[in-house]
Amino acid sequence: VDFVHVSGTTEEKHFPTANGSGVAVLDYDGDGRMDLYFASNGYILPDAPGLGRNRLYRNLGDGRFEDVTDASGLGFAGFCHGIVVGDVDNDGDPDVFLCNYGPNAFYRNEGDGTFTDATGSAGLGDPGWSSGGAFLDADDDGDLDLYVANYGSWSYPQDDQFCGDREADLRFYCSPREVRTVPHLFYRNEGDGTFTECAAEIGLGRDPSHQGHGFGVVAADLNDDGRIDLYVANDMNANFLFLNDGDGTFTDATEASGAAYDDMGNDQSGMGVDAEDVDGDGLPELFVTNFAGEYNTLYQNLGRGFFFDQTPSFGLAADSVPWVGWGCGLVDLDNDGWPDAFVSNGHVDDNRPGSEHAEPPLLHHNVPVDDSPGAGRRFRLATRDVGPYFASPHVGRGVAFGDLDDDGALDIVVNHKDGPPAILLNQTPAASQNGWIRLALVGTRSNRDGIGARVEVEAGGRAIRRQRKGGTSMLSAHDPRMIVGLGPAREAEAVVVRWPSGAVSELVGVPSGSTIEVIEPEGDPDA
C-alpha cells in the first residue's frame, strides 16, 4: 500500500485542510476479502499543486494489496474528507458515498469490480462542505437512507482570516467558531436509484439548533425500542441525538439526553464517535473524541434515551486530556467479549509553540474494576504493551476496523494527515486464544446490509449484545461483518438476530472460529 495522504496545508492554514480524511474497509469485489479505500484532500488555491486522489487497494489474501484505483473507477480527484459505504440498491455490492469540501460524490458498484459515478442521477451532489455520514434505514422500507454531517460554510478568499501571533508572524488554524454552521442533510432512498433530501420534513433540520460543525455520525438503537436512532458529534457545538419515532420521523432529544455536553454543561470539540455496550447491561454507551484540554467523553446509557458523562469513573478522562482525538472505536480487540477503546490522535497546528503536531494514539483495555464477582467495568491504558506504533507519535485522523487477514481478530487502519497510513495487524495473543464467531448478515425484507439489526449471543454464561451499526468513528467505514468475542467459551450456545423488519433468526451451538452467513427469514414476521 503506497498511498500518501495530501492535506493541502500551507502557511496560510486554510481551515478545511486541518481535518484530514478517512479510510474504508470493504469487500468491493465480493471475493470475501476486505479491501482498503483511502481518501485524500488537496490544495485550495487556484495556483496550488492541485487536489489529492483517493486510492483503492485490493486484498490479495497473502498479506499484500494491489492498487486497483484506475481499473475500479474509484479514483476520485477532489477534496475528500469522509467515506460512507452501504448497499443502497440491495444488489449485494457495496456502494460508496464521498463527503467532500465541494460537491459530494456517489459511486454505484456494478458488481464486476468497477464503479460508476452516479452522483447526478442519484441527486447526491450537494455542493457544500460535508465531513461524515451514515447509511441507515430510517423508515424501515428495506433500503438505506443517508445522513450527511456538514461541517460548515467556508470559502476562499472571503473567509480566509488571520488567526495566530502577528508579532511572531505565526499563523494558526482558526477556531471552529469562526466557521459558519449550516444544516445537515438527510436523503431518503426512493428505491429507484434516486434520493430526496428531506431533513426538515422528518425532524432533523427544523430549527437553527440542528446546525453544528458535524464530524462523526453513528446510527444505532440507542433507547432499546427496536428503532435505529442518530447521534452526531459536533465540533464546538452540542452533539445531536435524534430518536426514531417509528414512522419515518425523528424527535430531537439533544438537550434532554445528557449526551450533548460534558458533565459541566460545556460543549466540546466532538469529532469521532461510537456506540457500544461497555458495561454489559445490554445498552450501548456513547463515546466521543475531543480536542486537547478537554477529554474524550464516555456517556453511560441510563436507558430510555438518557445518558450521563461517566468518563472519569470509567478511567478514560485523564489519559486523553493532552491530545487531540479523531477517529475512534469501541471494539473488542482481544475477543474477551468486552469492547476496548482505540483513539487516533494528532494536533491541527504544526507550528504552535509548546504543542507537538504528532501525538501518540490511545488504547484502553476494558477490564473489571476488581476481582469480585459481578464487578463493574473500567478502562486501563494499554499502549505500552501492544506494539511499536503506540510508542511513537503520529498525525492521525480517520480510523477503520476490520479483519484484513481473516484470523478472527480486528485489525486497525489509520489514515494519517500528510503521510502514509498505518495498517496494524492484530497479533494480540488473547485474541487468538479466546473464542469468537463472525456473522455476515444478509437482509431480505430489511436492507441487505442488515444495518439496524440487533444481535444477542449467549456464551459461557454471559449475554453479549451487539448491533449492526451505520457510520461510527470519523470519516471512515468498517468491515461489515460482525466479530463477536466469546472469551474463554468454545462455542456460542445461542445466537439471536433481531432484524429491523421484526423477523428473528436463531442459531444454536455455533463453534468458536465459525463464520456464518445469516440470511433474514423472508416470511412476514407478523403473519
Model feature map: region roles:
Residues 2-22, 50, 72-84, 123-134, ...:
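Repeat-based blade/solenoid architectures
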Residues 39-51, 151-179, 343-358:
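Short, conserved, GDST-rich strand-edge loop motifs in beta-rich repeat architectures
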Residues 8-10, 315-318, 349-352, 356-370, ...:
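Gly/Ser/Thr/Pro-enriched helix-cap/hinge segments flanking short amphipathic alpha-helices
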Residues 68-85, 98-138, 148-177, 181-183, ...:
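Asp-box/WD-like beta-propeller blade repeats and closely related beta-sheet repeat scaffolds
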Residues 54-59, 182-189, 243, 300, ...:
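Beta-propeller blade signature
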Residues 33-40, 91-100, 146-150, 229-234, ...:
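Hydrophobic beta-strand segments that make up the repeating blades of beta-propeller
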Residues 1, 66-70, 116-120, 196-201, ...:
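Beta-propeller fold detector
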Residues 20-30, 58, 80-90, 94, ...:
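Beta-propeller blade termini
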